[in-house]
């Protein structure tokens, strides 16, 4: 059963998804245009933006990923949920 979360949870998750979508598209573009300086700059900007959004989300709602992608704090938060795929 999915846990109830506030609207801010969904807003932040949508921002992360949008930033990561841009990164996927830029990655595909850069596979065929590896020397496009503007695209490289945009990729690096969105990469930093995505990391920022994920840190912000995790500080409020817990880890998005496991296997070392999200450092453990005082407690092991992974099992506390809700997990991103449960909402």
Curated annotation (Swiss-Prot):
Species assigned in the record: Bacillus subtilis (strain 168)
Function, in words: The cotJ operon proteins affect spore coat composition. They are either required for the normal formation of the inner layers of the coat or are themselves structural components of the coat.
Name recorded for this polypeptide: Protein CotJB
Underlying gene: cotJB
Pfam families associated with the record: CotJB (PF12652)
